[in-house]
Amino acid sequence: MRKLTQFCLGLMLLPIAAVAQNQPTMKDVLGKYFLVGTALNSHQIWTHDPKIVHAITDNFNSVVAENCMKGEIIHPEEDYYDWHDADQLVKFAEQHKMTVHGHCLVWHSQAPKWMFTDKEGKEVTREVLIDRMYHHITNVVKRYKGKIKGWDVVNEAILDNGEYRQSPYYKIIGPDFIKLAFIFAHQADPDAELYYNDYSMSIPAKRNAVVKLVKELKAAGCRIDAVGMQSHNGFNYPNLEDYENSIKAFIAAGVDVQFTELDVNMLPNPKSFGGAEISQNYKYNKELNPYVNGLTKAAQKTFDQQYLSFFKIYRKYVDHIKRVTVWGVDDGSSWLNGWPVPGRTNYGLLIDRNYKVKPVVKEIIKLYE
């Protein structure tokens, strides 16, 4: 009798399990309009943990490296490239039939230590830095030619006030380092899409500067397919009207738009904090970490509303939006737990710490059905 009862219960549960497995995911529905991506860290690209693998492959059809393709990791010494993790990222994507985007070729932060100085520690000349930049871009892009759909060629070269960042690339080469980087990347893989990527893109001064840059690159004959709006957003920012105006401005400038590093910081920020400048670091303060045991109902509602607001905007411009990438797989592995304040518990992504899709995802999917 007990076996019969267990058998009957099993039959009753089968349809429920089947329904759960057949629920449409983001990649199933949103993927009809644009690529749905996530950033992978070095643990995730090597893992065999089925929970992590399924969280990635069930929900996303595109991946990008969180760190392993950045200069200091992939090219730590002038005559040595470390392809170990980057190759595995591409292999993981190929195994699971996912698209790969490359991040990033030229960035002032996490650049190789040797890039800007000679053996005596003196600043290199313009000619030397151009040559080093050329070889770095050429070797990295050619290695993954035909395997990577597109590259963030230059990352974060413009400040929030619209001026050029005074990076070593800018100081040594001048503003044309951006144009040269796009030329070198295109020469290395003529079929790869090329992007300019930056944060705080809803700020009007920054928006205008990026539009100007796009037009200058196009006038110079450079290939630039899209602007990447990183979208490291928060529970009370950005201003949605400004955010949408930037989308419209970039489209009007003749390029597509990609949302390349989407997350929603649910924690209060230090008073002087702004943007997504990775060099900003602050001491831990428990007042800045209010949700150690989970979001309150009010905070969860705000989280849901923010994500729904962004995806409602994206829905309006699907003809010009080619990719939306969330910056991380799950809350537990998100960079937001350690930046800009270390040791916090944040909830900025669409998959929770148990690798379960959050309820708001169903509402996002409904927007596109």
From Swiss-Prot:
GO BP term, example: xylan catabolic process
Signal peptide range: 1-20
Enzyme nomenclature, EC number: 3.2.1.8
GO MF entries: endo-1,4-beta-xylanase activity
Keywords: Carbohydrate metabolism, Glycosidase, Hydrolase, Polysaccharide degradation, Signal, Xylan degradation
Catalytic activity: Endohydrolysis of (1->4)-beta-D-xylosidic linkages in xylans
Pfam family, one: Glyco_hydro_10
Segments forming domain GH10: 21-367
Active site: 156, 261
Pathway assigned in UniProt: Glycan degradation; xylan degradation
InterPro entries: GH10, GH10_AS, GH10_dom, Glycoside_hydrolase_SF
Class in the EC hierarchy, top level: hydrolase
Annotated family: Belongs to the glycosyl hydrolase 10 (cellulase F) family.
Cited PANTHER family: ENDO-1,4-BETA-XYLANASE A (PTHR31490:SF90), GLYCOSYL HYDROLASE (PTHR31490)
Name used for this protein in its record: Endo-1,4-beta-xylanase A
